[in-house]
């Protein structure tokens, strides 16, 4: 942990996944690990608050990057484009997140603009977790 080395004040951001906020079949180990991120984030937010260290988590939906393209092909070899289309259709904004979308959310949580926010899960998911 970095927290013992932090002076009083600061921000810790845990990157998780929308899987940490929901459940779905055939992914229990992955979903369990992402829900664990939420639990440790909330515990640390409570523990670190007296030192004015804020702890939050971001939960991206699928992100348009090389890793996701590899996963799409892994889900259905030769049908990656169809997998992507199906996943995008499950997102109300009808697109994957971008790396920049996630970076901007992290930047906000790290900034003084969020100085009174701790212990929250920020879904960066185009509405995926609300439907």
Predicted feature residues:
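Alpha-helical segment proximal to the catalytic Tyr-Lys
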Residues: 4, 46-50, 115
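Active-site helix of classical SDR
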Residues: 33, 41
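Short, flexible catalytic-loop segment of classical short-chain dehydrogenase/reductase
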Residues: 38, 55, 60-74
